[in-house]
Amino acid sequence: MCHKMMNKFQQRLHHTTSTPLFKTCVYFSNWSVYQKKHFPQDIPIEYYTHIFYAFILIDEQTGKLKFSDEWCDLQMPQPSPNQSITGNLQQFYEMKKKNRHLKLIMSIGGWGTCHLFESVVSNDTKFDNFVNSTIEFAEKYGFDGVDIDWEYPKNSTQAAKLVELLARLRNKLNSKYIITVAAPGGSDNIEILKIQEMDKYLTFWNLMCYDFAGEGWSSKTAFHSNLFGNNGDNSLNASDVVQTYINKGVHPTKLILGMPMYGRIFHGVDRPEIGIPFTKERKSGCIEADVVDYNKFGDTFDYEDFDPRKVGALKYDSHSKQLITFDNLQCARIKASFIQSRQLGGGMWWDSAGDVSVTNDGCLVKNFVDQLGGVEVLEKSANNLHGC
């Protein structure tokens, strides 16, 4: 089935008149510099076109932007050989100077910050402060654009305010600046958004096609980032998410398919199977968390499988009774072919700390880019050098 699927994609590609250029985007979480010891210089930037810096926060009292961690953002000495550089943003700026196609986008908000956006859009003064400080941040700290990560507007009034927010940013920001959103995959959240109105002001959409299922809210084991079909717990899949946005008027080239560089763990699972109940019991030797980076799975799992129909992978540890679902290299390659066949804009990952080295055969971004046709088919428009 996997080979048939790949052949189908390739047949559709054969009829395209020109080779499109693709975006490869990845979120960099600023807290990764601590426990994970993951720094900007560790990102294989030859495989990425856009880096999304997560997260910039909003001051609830004023509506102005603020750093979530000023120490690591601006002051923390970088590792060798870049000890003379202080702060992640300065390091990224130096990387941009040497790699003029690399773009850095500030991602504002993130999970658990919806109340901050609600506070901003409900007060005219805060709204003005937000827009003006966003422009100041972009110009001062060397960003190429703004990513709004409002998870999520709760009703049509807030959805209209999000449109207004995007419109005001687009009006004030120089046209060279990129504006994006982290867009939901769940149908309830999608239906609230005013997609066509938002699309007028957006450069592209980052579709969060992951976390379709998880131990904290699912009743059965499931793939959490499957491309097709029922994932085991519900009917969510990435292909349907993409089609929903297309049906609502977004051009495919503006859609960026989001993928995980982490797995979701289900504890208390009797056997390596999707769609079965689990107890959440954490046995000795298990991974305590319900999320783990792709590069931290370890070698305790004694069973691995890949579903070519749904495009999802799993590992299972029969001793600790834990099952993990994730994207493996086959998923990365099939999703790359899917993006080509559907003429989408590219791929996105959360987050950069999760992948294995590009020297490892299982490197997700390298497999993805190689399947697209190599780094030669990646977008190469120039970045902005200002600030910092």
From Swiss-Prot:
Q: What is this protein called?
A: Chitinase 4
Q: Is Cytoplasm among this UniProt entry's keywords? A: no
- The gene name on file is CHT4
Where found, per UniProt?
Secreted
Family per similarity comment? Belongs to the glycosyl hydrolase 18 family. Chitinase class V subfamily.
Q: What range(s) does the GH18 domain occupy?
A: 22-375
Which annotated residues bind chitin? N82, Q83, G109, G110, W111, G112, Y152, M208, C209, Y210, D211, W350
Query: Main location per UniProt?
Result: secreted
**A family per Pfam:** Glyco_hydro_18
